[in-house]
């Protein structure tokens, strides 16, 4: 299974927001944010846009399809 690499945890730390606060802002659970940060879940396009909007950046700034992660 391939997952897209991301720097969501780094961006979240820069703005001093907890996983719960971010989850509430984009209408998902804290567990979803945790799974994305750990590379265990790829967000839907809708969620990716919501995250980018929250951080005021482009989707590509958070999610890097050039560095896919390989899960066994």
List where the protein language model places each region.
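Residue-level signal for the short linker/turn that defines the boundary of a DNA-recognition helix
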Residues: 6, 16-17, 43-46
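Residues in the helix-turn-helix
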Residues: 32, 42, 61
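DNA major-groove recognition helix of helix-turn-helix/homeodomain DNA-binding modules
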Residues: 46-61
